[in-house]
Amino acid sequence: MRYPAGWSTGADGALRNPHLSTLDAVVLPIIVFDRVISELGSSPGRVRVAAARLRSGAVAWTDLASVPVAVSVNGDEAGPWELTGTVGNMRVFVRLEGALDPHKRHTVASLAPAATVYGGAFRQTTTSSRLMRFEPESRTLIGEHRTKWDAKRIRTEAEGVESAWRPALTVIDHLAVMGQMAQSVIALSTDASRESMGTLWMRAIDIDAAEEPTVAPATWTSRMTLLRDRELRSDGLHDVRVQSTASTGVSVRASLAYTKGASS
């Protein structure tokens, strides 16, 4: 696994060694599922991600040259499907809903990761966000988000999970935006600068998608609430709980941590 140069930086802009991300922990089991279903001779195009549960290891996984993926796939043609296992040292559960299409067949070669939504096509959307309002009493931040499709690639074919809705928002789009919103609501609630927060890292995330994927381009809103921010140790380690709801029907609950005053 490789990340582009400058993928991970500190608050001061200094480069850091990248580590396995929560986005990878969602994507890799779905890539496995796409391959399994392809080998069975069916299409998962109308199968969507309904929920995901991620639990991190005690330390970040930094050996990106060797990321073990162990996934168990359980379900039937009508769905739902459950993917359970580990990615690196993260424990992962993904629930997929929707029926397979046994009449639309693809070869294993056609479902190479880069040809699927979660294998690579999800990168063809970009989201810009605008902070609309902060409510200090409830520690809630409201944001407006605009997700666009790369017009140069709009005709590019893709297969795999959620390809029937393409181009559309994926849970990856939501996780990326929610991470940014979490950083902002913590900074606003504690009257601290982003730089003084150091690195914010995930300890546990639960994401639920109540509706079918929202087709892009789309404008949507979210509400991010800081439920808890308490200092655990004298070195500035903070334990954080946040929850978020979006107009797209996606909700996120997360346990996070950061060390106040750390910049790397």
Regions found by a protein language model. Give the residues of each.
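Non-catalytic linker/capping segments at the edges of enzyme domains
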Residues: M1-D12, V87-L169, L237
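Hydrophobic beta-strand-centered segment that forms part of the acyl-chain substrate-binding groove
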Residues: V32-N74, S184-L227
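Hot-dog-fold acyl-thioester-processing enzymes
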Residues: M1-S42, K148-M197
